[in-house]
C-alpha cells in the first residue's frame, strides 16, 4: 500500500490558499481568527510570497 499523503503544492494552494479562504464565509472566519490570534502566517500562500 502507498502512503496516504501525496504532497502537491498546487492542490495545497488550491485548498488552503488565501484566495480559496476568501471565497467562503467560513474561510473568512478562519482568516479573521488567525489575524486575531496574531499569526504571522495566515495561509499556506504566505510561505511563498511573504
Swiss-Prot record:
Keywords: Ribonucleoprotein, Ribosomal protein. The keyword Ribonucleoprotein applies. Residues 1-23 are annotated as: Disordered. One of its GO terms (molecular function) is structural constituent of ribosome. Residues 9-22 have a biased composition (Basic residues). The keyword Ribonucleoprotein applies. One of its GO terms (cellular component) is ribonucleoprotein complex. InterPro entries: Ribosomal_bL34. GO terms for biological process: translation. Pfam families: Ribosomal_L34. Belongs to the bacterial ribosomal protein bL34 family. This is Large ribosomal subunit protein bL34. It comes from Azobacteroides pseudotrichonymphae genomovar. CFP2. The gene is rpmH.
Amino acid at each position: 500500500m502507498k502512503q496516504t499523503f501525496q504532497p502537491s503544492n498546487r492542490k495545497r494552494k488550491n485548498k488552503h490558499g488565501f484566495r480559496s479562504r476568501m471565497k467562503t464565509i467560513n474561510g473568512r472566519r478562519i482568516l479573521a481568527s488567525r489575524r486575531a490570534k496574531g499569526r504571522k502566517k495566515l495561509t499556506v500562500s504566505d510561505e511563498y510570497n511573504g
